[in-house]
Amino acid sequence: NLNLLGEREPGQYGQRTLADIMQELGQFAEGCGVSLDDHQTNSEGGMVDLIQQAGTEGVDYIIINPAGYTHTSVAIRDALLAVAVPFVEVHLSAVGAREPFRQISYFSDIAMGVISGFHGESYLLALQAILNRIEP
């Protein structure tokens, strides 16, 4: 449902669209001299395919918002483990302050870190955390 950002529950997820967030993130990445590819899919299989593609293309890091699959997807977890690309789990809402079922993540124990609750800024914070770990 990330394609509905800006329309769907703006109190939880913010008012900016995914395109707006990704444009800002891309500009920040470019200013830091790193390349960034962004993808969005509503399907679990599509997300597995994108993760596997990242692994074969030699991607250095993944920033992933598994959204509703956070609490359900062994397939996405297994794909992340299979490619062994370090990743940051991102959530726009403060999942720890939401319903109990949303507080369960199949990914947080294998992630470099988890950032949640900062709406669209969560992606920027994830990228900054990754850049801080890259040695000059």
Model features per residue range: what roles?
Residues D37-D38, V88, A97-P136:
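Short, glycine-/small-residue-rich phosphate/pyrophosphate-handling segment
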Residues T41-I62, G68-A84:
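N-terminal small/polar loop signature for handling phosphorylated ligands or for N-terminal nucleophile
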Residues R77-S93, S105-S108:
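Glycine/small-residue-rich loop that forms an oxyanion/phosphate-binding "nest" at active or ligand-binding sites
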Residues N1-G31:
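Glycine-rich phosphate/diphosphate-binding loop of Rossmann-like nucleotide-binding domains
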Residues L4-L5, T72-S73, R98:
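Glycine/Thr-rich phosphate-binding loops of Rossmann-like dinucleotide-binding domains
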Residues E30-G33, V83-V85:
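Short helix-capping segments at alpha-helix termini
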Residues R8-Y13, Q52-A54, I76-L80, R102-S105:
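Short, glycine/charged-enriched secondary-structure capping and boundary segments
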Residues N1-L2, A67-T70, S93-V95:
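Short glycine-rich anion-binding loops that position phosphate/pyrophosphate groups of nucleotides
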